[in-house]
A protein has these predicted regions:
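Positively charged n-region of N-terminal signal peptides that target proteins for export
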Residues: 1-4
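Hydrophobic h-region of N-terminal signal peptides that target proteins for export
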Residues: 8-17
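Low-complexity, acidic/polar, glycine-enriched regions of mature
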Residues: 17-218
Length: 218
């Protein structure tokens, strides 16, 4: 993997552009996937009905201009005017109803909803807190890699987490954001579900995959 410079984007600080914000929302191809295993088989539940909202304090033209310069290697102007290559960390919030997850099995879906206490805590939520360091550009894949901190809400419990994310510009109005988060259900007070009088037992390990297509709102 060939990597480019450590790009100091998405950092707090002065920026040389107007403050007209850009709002992005989740497109139809977005999904959040929960994956785990039991003593019998692996399981997977996928949710596509969600509210995801990102607000960047920079106009869309500036965001695209920064990406253009990075991908063209034309960044010399930032050596004397680094503020032109910056914009603040976005505000981002994701909410997905637990009842929207589909596992291909109604019994499994019911077990998952009970385990996550969907009646009391109907949503899985994530709120972006901060960017950890800079953004690395992979010259071979065109992906941007970073580590972010945020708050994950699951089954009524909230935990601050760090997660590695990758981002890609699909077009000048759409961006793909992907992250894979391994965690333990018990960290959120969730008892791994059982079925058939305890003969099938889910394991504690859970992987949450975020695969979001964010589109600039009109």
């Amino acid at each position: 993997m060939r990597t480019g410079i450590l790009i100091l984007l998405l950092v707090a600080g002065p920026a040389a552009h107007a403050s007209e914000p850009t709002r992005l929302a989740a497109g139809r191809q977005s999904a959040v996937v929960l994956e785990g295993s039991s003593n019998v088989t692996d399981w997977r539940c996928r949710g596509t009905s969600m509210d995801a909202d990102m607000l960047v304090a920079a106009p869309a033209d500036h965001i695209n201009a920064v990406i253009d310069r990075i991908e063209d290697g034309n960044i010399a102007v930032w050596m004397s005017e680094p503020a032109r290559g910056r914009f603040p960390t976005p505000r981002f919030h994701l909410r997905i109803p637990v009842t929207s997850f589909r596992c291909g099995n109604r019994i499994m879906e019911g077990d998952m909803r009970r385990a996550l206490r969907a009646g009391e805590h109907p949503d899985v939520e994530f709120t972006l807190g901060a960017l950890r360091g800079g953004v690395q550009h992979d010259l071979d894949t065109g992906l941007y890699h970073a580590t972010i901190a945020g708050e994950l809400g699951l089954a009524g419990q909230r935990r601050t987490i760090d997660v590695a994310v990758s981002a890609q510009r699909i077009s000048r109005s759409s961006f793909r954001i992907r992250a894979v988060l391994p965690l333990q259900m018990s960290d959120f007070g969730v008892t791994p579900p059982t079925a058939l009088f305890g003969t099938i037992r889910a394991r504690d390990a859970l992987t949450v995959t975020f695969d979001l297509m964010l589109e600039i709102a009109p």
